Amino acid sequence: RQMCIRDRFQRGRPAASLLCTKEPCIAVNTESENRSTFWYGDFDEPSCKFRTWQIPCSSHDSLYNLVTYYRLGYGTESLHRLGRELEWEGYQGEALDTPYYFVFHAAFEALYHWVREGIPAPHAPKIETEMTYAATDPTGVQAANRTDSLGNALGGIRYPAADCPTSVCQSYTVREDGGLQQMFGTEYPFPPEKLKAVYGDLGHYRALAEKSADNAVAHGWILADDRDELVRIAVETAARRGL
């Protein structure tokens, strides 16, 4: 059903929306999915109202949505009933914990206004990719996200974790035994020396984070109500990592 608006070779014309209905749809993808979804682009046709929102410096699961959320008490009964514990299983770097969930807040609000009021959702650039025709990482996907000079994905919805990163992010985790947590990402924090070389001091970093957040709000990718919290998290993360 998805093939009506996606095409790995970026050809073709849609006949319907994601679920072959006339209702609007916003496909929000992290770096765990964007290389294998191959969305053609956005559409505003009567039979296909569609947006692709792609978030760099993210993974399908993160420390917040797979570990912290449950430790706060949400859903713990279900976990206990299943006899499961949710943990990051990496042995290098840190569990990915970029606050990309704020983008989902904006996506839900945009979708509501699109469905209820006919106000089209904002457009967003796709993460820049290139076909490799061979596996580029342990997940086996034959496409790669192009990266900037700091090692993170180019394009996509920009927010402080992507515009002024304090780590290199990857969308999967390698266990010590060589196995994978394919949908739970890893961050490799920059050493304090690199943070200082790139950003100077925490005051300058805050200014960059505020500029990034303001740009995201202006484009409709972040809610205005979430702006200050997004900046706070970015600055506190930079300080914790030694800036």
Regions found by a protein language model. Give the residues of each.
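Short, small-residue-biased leader/transition segments that mark boundaries at the very start
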Residues: 1-5
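Conserved alpha/beta-hydrolase "acid-adjacent" motif
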Residues: 34-38
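Alpha/beta-hydrolase-fold serine-hydrolase catalytic core, especially in secreted/extracellular enzymes
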Residues: 9-12, 18-23, 28-31, 41-51, ...
